[in-house]
């Protein structure tokens, strides 16, 4: 069964985007998953992923935006035989494409690891860049079985800062932490994770996430209610037990006939009906129905009298 993260990424790879927004998505995918090699005095670009749908997405975006045909190379990982590595390899127009995506400086040939300023200026490009970043190195926990958590990994601090800035532009309350091998921006609030999925265009995944979240919250609410009711029931049982113990003490040491009539009446009734509620006791009063608070007051008075007699014995 596919993971929730896989379902999100599959949906993202099927979105249609405007060429300018496709550039922003490509910029993230290449900056985060790409590598350059020199072959016959020219650059060869390799963009690597373990997800075949993402590999097809990269291939399609390059063809859509730059009209270049890339090659798709598949490798089997020897250590993990079930896993394949998909490499989108581009041998033509690499310098021009990387320059256009603000990854390569055509004059100095320096590689930029920062989010392009042109992306940070326009919300739709930010959405597309975040989509590419999530496809490249993002993950999200299954909302049905795990704690809520979504993250995007970056190798470089300045790139991580750009991801954080974009996510918080959309009021996602994102946070960041340094890891041994890089940096991550993460979300832990369910509502913000749903908002992020909406931001990057994973609408169906967002709706599924929200459905699961609502059911999970309902289950938690029911459990809290049941626990609260159980706690209240235990308190009621403990209180009734204490009342009966005190009434029996008075019966054996004082005599119920020596109590005031109203207290004697409630004492006899409580002994006869140890399991009923205060409200039910009030309705059973032979001299006439009284309120729950009235019953409670009389029983508290009996407790006080019994405890007053017991204190000298304890001393």
Swiss-Prot record:
Lineage per the UniProt record: Bacteria, Bacillati, Bacillota, Bacilli, Lactobacillales
Protein name: Probable cell division protein WhiA
Gene Ontology molecular function, alphabetical: DNA binding
Cell division among keywords: yes
Function: Involved in cell division and chromosome segregation.
NCBIfam families on file: DNA_bind_WhiA
Family that this chain belongs to: Belongs to the WhiA family.
Record keyword RNA-binding present: no
UniProt source species: Lacticaseibacillus paracasei (strain ATCC 334 / BCRC 17002 / CCUG 31169 / CIP 107868 / KCTC 3260 / NRRL B-441) (Lactobacillus paracasei)
One GO-annotated biological process of the protein: cell division
Family annotation (Pfam families): HTH_WhiA, LAGLIDADG_WhiA, WhiA_N
HAMAP family the record matches: HTH_type_WhiA
Family matches, as SUPFAM superfamilies: Homing endonucleases
Residue range(s) of DNA binding per entry: 277-311
Gene: whiA
InterPro entries registered for this protein in UniProt: Homing_endonucl, Sporu_reg_WhiA_N_dom, Sporulation_regulator_WhiA, Sporulation_regulator_WhiA_C, WhiA_LAGLIDADG_dom
Alphabetic keyword roster: Cell cycle, Cell division, DNA-binding
